[in-house]
């Protein structure tokens, strides 16, 4: 399954030329600077979709929150075939997400794992509010499945460290 980088076209990000995790991270950070400045690289998506139809060779996996304000591929100015992206509320992973990360590293051979956090995370806010108000997660959200995420986050919250929440 580990295909040679030369088996796939170079994308605008230049990520496939990176040979080690530090180079991949540097290129992702360059892409983030382009995103922040509004000078994204051009992407020929049709060509990239066609050229990756028979295989892929991502160089990183990014674990991020599901927050719609943090579109991973755009945040790092990457394109089709550059990265794997795993998204879950609050970056709290379970066995299936961990299995995907293992696949990316062990089978596909990605060179870097990135855990991308962000400000004003709704899941983190809900977990903090539950701890501060002394609610259990189902009471805090009135959701059926979200508590499984909040229950993993709550023990990590030190109520004494919270200021003016």
Please describe what each predicted stretch is:
Residues 114-120:
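Histidine-centered catalytic micro-motifs
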Residues 28, 62, 86, 115:
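Divalent metal-coordination and catalytic microenvironments
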Residues 63-100:
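Active-site cofactor/substrate anionic-group-binding motifs, chiefly glycine-
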Residues 60-61, 109:
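Short, intrinsically disordered/low-complexity patches at protein termini
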